[in-house]
Amino acid sequence: MNTTITSKDEILCVCRELIRKEGYKSINIRHVAKCCHISVGSVYNYFESKTDLIAETVASVWCDIFHFPDNRNPESDNPDSPDESKIFQSFPDCVAWIFDRLKQGEEKYPGFFSLHSMGFIEEEKMDVQERMDRSWFHIRQSLVVVLKNDANIRSDAFDENFTEEDFAEIIFSLILASFVQHDFDAKRIFNMIRKMLY
């Protein structure tokens, strides 16, 4: 058996491929070790338990689905620098990109979204949820950044009682509801955004 050290990222890459081809149930320490051509102990060097491995794999899948290429990271935008190119021309462009990524994610990882609807298995649910929340945090932050950079939004759209953060949270909740329902048609959300912001 090849016992050379394998990086955590390489193991997670194999786990993503397993989820894609064999489904969620294929993620266990022994099977992952076999597919990585490493010892079971080597997997435990990076993951304390099966729960830890599954939670990290789920977070890794979400990061793969919503990975911003280097030139499309909204958090790298400096709103005080007008010369810096913006990644999205408008907030609806950003939401369209998210829906497109969800659709591609469903195609790349068939059945993955259904796992979230079912809540995974009970003993792993909390840890997976916490890591999923962390991996989604950057999406919510990105929505806020894009809102603040969209020069076409009405000047009176936001105030101290209804902030960009509040609106981003509402839109994110609608996006999550759409993904749970496997509804990747964002037309109604776009209509709401246009009526409220422009």
Each language-model region and where it sits:
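Helix-turn-helix
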Residues: 10, 14, 18-52, 56, ...
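Short, amphipathic alpha-helical "lid/cap" segments that border enzyme active or binding sites
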Residues: 12, 66, 92, 96, ...
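Hydrophobic alpha-helical connector segments
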Residues: 56, 70-108, 164-168
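Phosphate/oxyanion-binding loops and surfaces in catalytic or ligand/nucleic-acid-binding neighborhoods
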Residues: 60, 64, 101-109, 146-149, ...
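Short secondary-structure transition hinges
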Residues: 93, 97-141
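Short alpha-helical scaffolding segments that buttress acidic/His motifs in well-ordered protein cores
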Residues: 116, 171-175
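Hydrophobic alpha-helical bundle segments that form small-molecule/ligand-binding pockets
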Residues: 124-129, 133-168, 197-198
